[in-house]
From Swiss-Prot:
The chain crosses the membrane at residues 21-43, 47-64, 76-98, 118-140, 209-231, 251-273, 285-307, 311-333. The gene is flhA. The lineage of its organism: Bacteria, Pseudomonadati, Pseudomonadota, Gammaproteobacteria, Enterobacterales. Keywords: Bacterial flagellum biogenesis, Bacterial flagellum protein export, Cell membrane, Membrane, Protein transport, Transmembrane, Transmembrane helix, Transport. It comes from Buchnera aphidicola subsp. Baizongia pistaciae (strain Bp). Belongs to the FHIPEP (flagella/HR/invasion proteins export pore) family. This is Flagellar biosynthesis protein FlhA. The keyword tRNA-binding does not apply.
Amino acid sequence: MANILSIFKTFEIKRLVKFQTLSGPVLILIILSMMVLPLAPFILDLFFTFNIALSIVVLLMSMFTTKTLEFTSFPTILLFSTLLRLALNIASTRIILLNGHIGSCSAGNVIQAFGHFLVGGNFTIGIIVFIILIIINFMVITKGASRIAEVGARFTLDGMPGKQMAIDADLNAGLIGEKQAKKRRIEINQEADFYGSMDGASKFVRGDAIAGILIMIVNIIGGLVIGILQHNMTFSQAAQVYTILTIGDGLVAQIPALVVSTASGVIVTRVSTDQNVSEQIVSQLFCNPQVILLSGIVLGVLGLVPGMPNIIFLIFTTLLFFISWLIYRNPVIFTNFESTMKKIDNTNFCNISDASWNDVQLEGSISIELGNLLIPMIKVNSKKSNLLDKIRNVRKKCAKNIGFLPPLVHIRDNNNLPGNCYCILIKGIEISKGTVQCGKFLAINSGNASGPLPLPAEETSDPIFKFKSFWITSELINQAKQKGYNIAEDSTVISTHLNHIILTHISLLFGRQEAQQLLDYVSKFCPKLIEDLIPNSINLTIFHQVLQNLLIENVPIRDMQTILETLITHAPNYQNDSQILTSLVRISLGKLIIQNIFQNNKIEVIKFDSKLEQILLKTIANKDSVLEPGLYNYIVVKLQQEYNNCKLKNIPCVLLVHHNLRVFIAKMLLKNIPKIFVLSNLELEDVTKIYTTNIIGDQTKT
């Protein structure tokens, strides 16, 4: 049974394909036959009805398409419909002139109905109506559509190179696949062909309108001559019969022509969206209740003019007021729900494709994940200062202070996070997280505030320094400021946290790509230095390692000229040793390092006892030996105590060591007390006054 159904289905498909293939040639043969062979009135009625139906179908099709490329056959249909009308004019002219003397029914019921019913049997009115239709079709609709098609064809052709380049750029960037690129190129070519064809096809309609006028004149004159000379009719009889038939013939041809012309205007004037013409008009015309309300007021004022049909104006005024109220109460009442659902369905079910490289999501250098309640903070059109603007400012500030532009910050939502939570990641690894009350303000007690805040303040802690804080509404801001709290917006909390994370992990964000970008930028100002350095002196890898070593210890790399000159000077001797080159660069940047740490204040440092320093120097001199665990713990504990003391005094904790010890001690402390600054004696060589606050190892017995 299944096999029989399958065979039957295959036969039906083949028959449908054969019908579609033969429909065009058959239609052309029928049109040519109508021009040559005499037709019976019934057959003529059949073809006139078909012509009217075709014009209605074409008009509705043009209105229900969402894109012009959905109806690319329209220029060809325009040609066939014009040819069909001309063939009908020839056939009807033949039958009117042959059998017109018999009566108005001799040319078929359709022509008789248009000649008698539509114009009341008055040929004078018929001629006037016919001329008006010709003017509307020829001078208004066709001329406008022709001009739009001409301009559209020109702009489409002019824009083709740019569109092709955009497709190539998207393809190279991996935003689209090869199949999508090929499909877009085909659509561009089809669009150009369509508008080019429409530019020429519009001339068919204009020619059809002109032909209609000439055919009407020929039919009237020919009918009068034949009626008077061949059928012995009086002038008034011949004029009445042949003119009515000619007017009916003209109207039955020109009304479908007007409909098809309107369809061509709809096609070329529409803007391609996900909505058809009707949906576009309704959704855009009734989107603003104020416009409808003002229209109703103006209409009501006009209705008060003496002599106006007040009842009719009142009805339409009331209708406009009602529509305005309806839109105001329910703004989405005229939106295109059907198209939206169709789009969702297509997204979920129709556009499912095989996995490709476009589905691979590479981790960005730095990213922020937001809970679903924090999504409103990234609205671009928000009147408040939004999160995106503040993140841009963070990158600008870091670029200005550090000396290189941090990577772009990728923001995405994460439904697995609590609604008020956000998470900061570097290369896909979670670094820190916090919570934010969207729309509220964070009152931070940095040590100067006097007492807690009243309800509805919600107690929390600052995400960076863990200070006691409160989430408050705008009504409590003045009260919080009076008590000594620092106030921060919701988006400022996240951006400040991000700024802190970037500064404390800046070395992780400085990769080889950023190093190359920095070189490209500096080459605009110091091209000779770049040319002498890379690849003549050192390679990009060593250059990147030197800068990364500086960033690990929070040394800015703004003074690139000094860095490059130092590397060029010492690279011949230490070409492959990034640690030594880093130490030499630090010596050259000594004044900058001191300025950043001490902020032009008194230089207070901690030192090692000379005996302890000698032990450490002997340890690092022997590359195979390691620091004794007891001594290691002693140094770490003592330095931790010194750091805590400096933190209480709000001064930087700086350890001054021998130049050869600096790298070793810095690496050791980086794992335990990363906030201690380790300087070498050569970096402070130009400093005259150094105050030693403590010496570690005074009581150490070696």
